[in-house]
């Protein structure tokens, strides 16, 4: 879908709910950056979270957030060190840690929730026992995004009898 449609949708939702939003693009780093850059000025003053910022697009997403007073969802593969590295890069860009949330990727399938949870635990241990400021951030767990990638989530009653209408 066009970026203009994402902007119009974000504006309509923001006006309807009146609270800060967490806005993510379609999952492609370049497209996510384009959406963040287009949506950020429209939502000035609402302190929304823009994302997903990755190693490939953190400069563009971070600059959009910094320029218009938003926060960033920093997304990294399921790895504590990569999550910390991205947090460091975003703070060096000028974002305050208070405006960051981490998405260390949640594997509803594949790696599984257990492995994802163990990464969350190690992140919290680093934050608490090592007093690591870059890891003392809120965690965003996007479990649903991974679950919807499964073929069963898109199958209808005809494709998978007994599963119900999905």
Place the predicted regions along the sequence by residue:
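Active-site beta->alpha loop and helix N-cap motifs at the rims of alpha/beta catalytic domains
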Residues: 1-84
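Catalytic alpha/beta core domains of metabolic enzymes, predominantly
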Residues: 56-166
């Amino acid at each position: 879908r066009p970026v203009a449609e994402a902007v119009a949708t974000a504006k309509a939702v923001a006006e309807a709910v009146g609270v800060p939003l967490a806005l993510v693009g379609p999952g492609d780093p370049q497209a996510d950056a384009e959406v963040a850059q287009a949506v950020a000025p429209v939502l000035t003053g609402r302190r929304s979270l823009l994302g997903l910022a990755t190693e490939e697009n953190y400069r563009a997403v971070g600059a959009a957030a910094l320029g218009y007073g938003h926060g960033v969802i920093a997304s990294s593969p399921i790895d504590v060190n990569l999550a910390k590295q991205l947090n460091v890069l975003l703070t060096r860009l000028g974002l305050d840690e208070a405006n960051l949330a981490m998405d260390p990727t949640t594997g509803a399938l594949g790696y599984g929730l257990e492995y994802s949870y163990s990464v969350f635990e190690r992140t919290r241990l680093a934050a608490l026992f090592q007093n690591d400021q870059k890891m003392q951030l809120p965690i965003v767990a996007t479990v649903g995004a991974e679950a919807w990638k499964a073929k069963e989530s898109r199958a209808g009653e005809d494709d998978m009898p007994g599963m119900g209408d999905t």
